[in-house]
């Protein structure tokens, strides 16, 4: 079969390597310039390519696999929309596992997929997690697994026509990626396609945006984050008490994730008590409400993964008193920040802003009378936060914006924050 790959990012690069090894004809179309190493590899493998443009030549292929980053209204693709596919769609069509669980949502996707995989592994069940989680879906090609856990983005769902999913889960829908999607409705309907693709669709019935745009189907099953709450040594889920001592999973966002996970395992007829016993050993993920250090009674938390206002709102929900010094930064996604400003007024004592976020929030912060400081960079922000802090305060990096204004990704941003906190501790010891 003849494949055109539009965009040569992580997912399509992995797919290209698999497809060429299977004997398929490949044409790669990419707006950026290829490196000499990439061109050499293309030549060695007999792969035709174009760079600096996406021409009509892509329409000559039998299948056009669109990278998640390629815009939905790309003019070259409008002429051959009937041939467009996502990488996940191609992978599932070629490699049919026994059972596929797919997860999407504005927040909590990666953690939820990690929780599912963790339980399967601890039970000795053959499983594999891939997709938007960091491991390309194409990596699963060539071997069978009993349980395939997929993290799927709104972009991948938009480009997908049909996915064969056993259980599909929509965790939540909050305004996000509105620099790509033209409206919240467009974004929400892309997410909700997952329920249409699934034998059993699980959705958050407490999420207003899901309930606004969802279509009633007989295959749907609801989970309700309002029916789970933490108690001192456990949780109460759907009216039943369970011993559970993992404090990381008892934070605001993770209780929502846990509610979805328990609904999945309930649908699969797993013993929920056993599932929770396993999850007590689950360790926190990097850059998600990650404890960094405590210096002179001031706690530093790294939540660099919070790349939208909804994620930062959720992070702030973990604090009951206004003892948070919040670091905001990054590139906006065409969001309305009114809800974020309201949450900051309730939860934070001071805001420090740097990067492109300064121009987005300066006027709103000024009008809201929230104490704020504009900083040049991460190092100055950390130093200023500690300077104005008091014992018992929390310095929280939860940026509410994408990292690409100053960093390659949210991981690099989070590591920079960690290093600046280490530098601060070192200076205090001098």
From Swiss-Prot:
Keyword Transmembrane helix part of the UniProt annotation: no
Functional pathway: Cell wall biogenesis; peptidoglycan biosynthesis
GO biological process terms on file: cell division; cell wall organization; peptidoglycan biosynthetic process; regulation of cell shape
Classification via InterPro entries: Mur-like_cat_sf, Mur_ligase_C, Mur_ligase_C_dom_sf, Mur_ligase_cen, MurD
Reactions that this protein is recorded to catalyse: UDP-N-acetyl-alpha-D-muramoyl-L-alanine + D-glutamate + ATP = UDP-N-acetyl-alpha-D-muramoyl-L-alanyl-D-glutamate + ADP + phosphate + H(+)
A GO molecular function held by the record: ATP binding
SUPFAM superfamilies per record: MurCD N-terminal domain, MurD-like peptide ligases, catalytic domain, MurD-like peptide ligases, peptide-binding domain
Keyword terms of this UniProt record: ATP-binding, Cell cycle, Cell division, Cell shape, Cell wall biogenesis/degradation, Cytoplasm, Ligase, Nucleotide-binding, Peptidoglycan synthesis
TM regions (residue ranges): none
Enzyme class: ligase
Cell location: Cytoplasm
HAMAP family named among the record's database cross-references: MurD (MF_00639)
Function comment: Cell wall formation. Catalyzes the addition of glutamate to the nucleotide precursor UDP-N-acetylmuramoyl-L-alanine (UMA).
Similarity comment: family membership: Belongs to the MurCDEF family.
The name this protein goes by in its record: UDP-N-acetylmuramoylalanine--D-glutamate ligase
Gene name in the database record: murD
């Amino acid at each position: 079969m003849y494949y055109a790959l539009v965009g040569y990012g992580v997912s399509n690069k992995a797919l290209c390597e698999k497809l060429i090894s299977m004997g398929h004809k490949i044409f790669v179309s990419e707006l950026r310039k290829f490196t000499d190493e990439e061109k050499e590899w293309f030549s060695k493998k007999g792969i035709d390519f174009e760079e600096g443009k996406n021409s009509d030549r892509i329409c000559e292929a039998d299948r056009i696999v669109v990278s998640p980053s390629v815009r939905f209204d790309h003019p070259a693709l409008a002429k051959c929309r009937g041939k467009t596919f996502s990488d996940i769609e191609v992978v599932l069509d070629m490699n049919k596992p026994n059972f596929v669980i797919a997860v999407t949502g504005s927040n909590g996707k990666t953690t939820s997929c990690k929780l599912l995989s963790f339980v399967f592994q601890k039970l000795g069940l053959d499983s594999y997690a891939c997709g938007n989680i960091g491991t390309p879906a194409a990596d699963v090609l060539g071997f069978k697994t009993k349980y395939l856990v997929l993290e799927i983005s709104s972009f991948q769902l938009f480009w997908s026509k049909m996915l064969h999913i056993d259980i599909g889960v929509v965790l939540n829908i909050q305004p996000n990626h509105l620099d790509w999607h033209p409206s919240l409705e467009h974004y929400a309907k892309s997410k909700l396609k997952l329920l249409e693709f699934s034998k059993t669709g699980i959705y958050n019935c407490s999420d207003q945006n899901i309930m606004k745009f969802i279509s009633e189907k007989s295959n749907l099953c609801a989970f309700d984050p309002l029916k789970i709450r933490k108690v001192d040594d456990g949780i109460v889920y759907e009216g039943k008490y369970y011993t559970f001592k993992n404090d990381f999973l008892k934070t605001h966002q993770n209780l929502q994730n846990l509610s979805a996970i328990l609904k999945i395992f309930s649908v699969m007829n797993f013993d929920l008590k056993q599932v929770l016993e396993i999850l007590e050993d689950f360790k926190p993920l990097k850059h998600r409400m990650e404890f960094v250090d405590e210096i002179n009674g001031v706690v530093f938390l790294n939540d660099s993964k919070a790349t939208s206002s909804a994620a930062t709102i959720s992070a702030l929900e973990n604090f009951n008193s206004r003892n948070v010094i919040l670091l905001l930064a990054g590139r906006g996604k065409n969001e309305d920040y009114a809800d974020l400003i309201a949450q900051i007024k309730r939860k934070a004592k001071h805001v420090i802003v740097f990067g492109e976020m300064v121009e987005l929030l300066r006027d709103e912060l000024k009008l809201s009378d929230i104490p704020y400081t504009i900083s040049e960079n991460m190092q100055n922000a950390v130093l200023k936060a500690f300077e104005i802090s008091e014992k018992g305060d929390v310095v929280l990096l939860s940026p509410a914006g994408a990292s690409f204004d100053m960093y390659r990704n949210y991981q690099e941003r989070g590591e920079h924050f960690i290093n600046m906190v280490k530098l601060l501790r070192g200076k205090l010891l001098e």
